[in-house]
Amino acid sequence: MAAPVMTVSDSKDLRGLNLIAAHSHIRGLGVDATTLEPRASSQGLVGQEKARKAAAVMLQMIKEGKIAGRAVLIAGPPSTGKTAIAMGMAQSLGPDVPFTTLASSEIFSLEMSKTEALTQAFRKSIGVRIKEESEIMEGEVVEIQIDRSVTGSAKQGKLTIKTTDMEAVYDMGSKMIDAMTKERVMAGDIISIDKSSGKITKLGRSYARSRDYDAMGVDTKFLQCPDGELQKRKEVVHTVTLHEIDVINSRTQGFLALFSGDTGEIRSEIRDQINTKVGEWKEEGKAEIVPGVLFIDEVHMLDIECFSYINRALEDDLAPVVIMASNRGNSRIRGTDYRSPHGLPLDFLDRVAIINTHSYTPEEIKQIISIRAQEEEVDVHPDALALLTKIGQEAGLRYASNLITTSQLVSAKRKAKQVEVSDVQRSFQLFYDPARSIKFVAESEKRLIGNTGAVDFSVGAAVSNGEEKMDLS
């Protein structure tokens, strides 16, 4: 009898949607929870202690809801971790506080005005925590009886459900029977039924029925039988943004516009009505305003009209904390001939709290590259790590980070498990850094097409032996 053929798949598991991005290694700001003192290297962030401490103070005030309508500027040279600090703040805020990221160039669109794009970004960054009381039934299913008529008319049934204190029998209609069948509810399950919507949630199985089957799935959860009354009132908290409420109330298709992305321009009258309604909910204690964070990267790309709008928007009652990043020095404000620090108007710069970042030390660059290598699952030899650190100092941290993956591909070509110095050198020769690219452009300027569109093909046509003219013989 022939042995069965064994097949081995050597394909790697895909990471799904969790792809490796530039800041995917950042888990938080890396500060002590009580003293807010920054650690040397923690949660993916290295160095920049003063900037991280300042960001942590802002973060603490945002969490406590003490500040809103403030503007913070993170300013520093390129590759000094400005966006990384903002991403660390986003990770530390948690899921309940809205955090919106916006690149300055995103607001310049033919479909939507600049002020509308900024308004939507501001309203995405303001959360509304709505409290709602719902009546639920929670207990252990004792028995389910379903009567199916011979004629095929509507099904009827009875549900017996109990807690440790009481037991009750309820009549079920066809919709409830279908929901029970869909959730595969059986005797011994502990379920929760929302009376207002009829939603059935299967919480787990009772400990009393744990020996009913010899084998169970890994997702089977055993719980104690609930005690007290069968019917209870439970407070449910939903957190939505003002922009989501705007979209639902402004479009004929309602909440479907949230998924299609076709929000378009939203009229100011609708926003005013929503603001009034949210204010009423707040006074009645039904809702709570959660001021979030709007992060605008490359803020110097905004024009003077946008700065004027942000100036006014920060004075509004419903305004988030605006965090901006800029790597410019004295530069021209877009839309004017004026020059200003960081490319921001002086009257706007007056309102801004500025956090400075400085260049990384060689040791900090080494730690960052090591963290990136771990995130990308690349084993780097210590000598290769030292070379990447040197490249990071001279050519820039981004370029050195990009060389990690390319060096790993070069090492995989020779079936090596560790990235060596030769692999980094090979990648360095294949891919130019900005300095070498500038040098190449300067040397080949006449061969490249200039502003006028002219190019001189005669230059550089000489062969390598030093002849001035091309020899075709």
Swiss-Prot record:
Origin: domain of life: Eukaryota
Q: Which InterPro entries does the record match to this protein?
A: AAA+_ATPase, P-loop_NTPase, RuvB-like, RuvB-like_C, RuvBL1/2_DNA/RNA_bd_dom, TIP49_P-loop
- Note one Pfam family from the annotation: TIP49
Keywords of the record: Activator, ATP-binding, Chromatin regulator, DNA damage, DNA repair, Helicase, Hydrolase, Nucleotide-binding, Nucleus, rRNA processing, Transcription, Transcription regulation
Where, in this chain's numbering, is ATP bound? 76-83
**Family matches, as Gene3D superfamilies:** 1.10.8.60, P-loop containing nucleotide triphosphate hydrolases, RuvB-like helicase, domain II
Q: Does the keyword Nucleotide-binding apply?
A: yes
Give the EC number(s) listed in the UniProt record: 3.6.4.12
Please name the SUPFAM superfamilies in this protein's record: P-loop containing nucleoside triphosphate hydrolases
Q: Does the keyword RNA-binding apply?
A: no
Mainly resides where?
nucleus
Catalyzed chemical reaction(s)? ATP + H2O = ADP + phosphate + H(+)
- In its UniProt record, which GO terms are filed under biological process? chromatin organization; DNA repair; rRNA processing
**Intracellular or extracellular location(s):** Nucleus
Q: Which GO terms describe its cellular component?
A: nucleus
Q: A Gene Ontology MF term for this entry? A: ATP hydrolysis activity
Its annotated function is as follows: DNA helicase which participates in several chromatin remodeling complexes, including the SWR1 and the INO80 complexes. The SWR1 complex mediates the ATP-dependent exchange of histone H2A for the H2A variant HZT1 leading to transcriptional regulation of selected genes by chromatin remodeling. The INO80 complex remodels chromatin by shifting nucleosomes and is involved in DNA repair. Also involved in pre-rRNA processing.
* SUBUNIT field: May form heterododecamers with RVB1. Component of the SWR1 chromatin remodeling complex, the INO80 chromatin remodeling complex, and of the R2TP complex.
* Family of this protein: Belongs to the RuvB family.
Know the name of this protein? RuvB-like helicase 2
Q: Which organism is it from?
A: Gibberella zeae (strain ATCC MYA-4620 / CBS 123657 / FGSC 9075 / NRRL 31084 / PH-1)
